Amino acid sequence: MSKFKLKNLIRAIFKKEFKLNVNDQINNNNYTISENKISNKKYKIKIITSYDEGFNKVGNKTKETFKKYAEIQGYNFQNITMPNTGRPPAWNKIRILMDEMIKKEFEFLMWIDADAFFNNYNIDIANEIEQEKEIYMVKHYCEVHKGSIYQNTKLTILRINTGVLLMKNSEHNLKFLQKVWDKKEYINHQWCEQAAIMDLMDFKSELNGNLNDNKGNSYLEKVKFLSNDWNSIPSNLDLSTEKQDPIIIHLAGMKFKERIKYINTKLKL
């Protein structure tokens, strides 16, 4: 066999194997970020947020970006009065989403935490909607507390973030939210309702300390993981895994004064 034919044979084998490997990963890796399948349909979407009086200095500014995005994209927006459920405020998003779903006025509900704001108003969230998916959110690589045995290395794990949630108004999601609400063991957890969702979806590694217990379950069949553009947490690192010009910036984990300072510097209206 000539060298030319041998090279072509090797190239063909590699291309075939590479294609098989990629397909295998797509079919078996529930953490794959879905490709953007652009939808031409315009859905009835309601953007919602809620915060208490102690968060006014942040929420009163960020909500204006939600309102502006809704106006540009042709959606509805409401800043809902924080209900008195007796739980930490972060939990109330679950109660609010359930109450809004029961009304059946909108096809999709988009929750955004009050410590997040739109940075780019021109990209339609409806472009992310896929017929078989009902829950849309972002996941981030986060450093875990257990140290690595290797020098100059850190262990990271994928953690879901519920600061931005797009949910289809469906019976599946209403039942899911009720199960989240019923996870009372997480009422006072540092991640509140997010910890309950992590438990329900079998992302338990950061809840029980077992780093292998993060594989997910059948709930992921209805979940689409969006790119970090939709929920980008600022980093102090020069090289960040987050996007340089994201759609939504989420000031998760920041102190209140730092949030105000960041918003005054970065928020675009």
Describe the function of each predicted region.
Residues 39-42, 128-131, 156-160, 239-244:
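Extracellular/periplasmic catalytic domains that process cell-envelope and extracellular macromolecules
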Residues 118-157:
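Conserved donor-nucleotide/metal-binding helix-loop-beta segment in metal-dependent transferases, i.e.
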Residues 82, 114-116, 121:
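Short acidic donor-binding/metal-coordinating loop in glycosyltransferase active sites
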Residues 6-107, 205:
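N-terminal anchoring/stem segment of glycosyltransferases
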Residues 88-91, 95, 167-268:
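Catalytic core and acceptor-binding pocket of nucleotide-sugar-dependent glycosyltransferases
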Residues 152-167, 189:
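A recurrent flexible, glycine/aromatic-enriched loop bordering the glycosyltransferase active site
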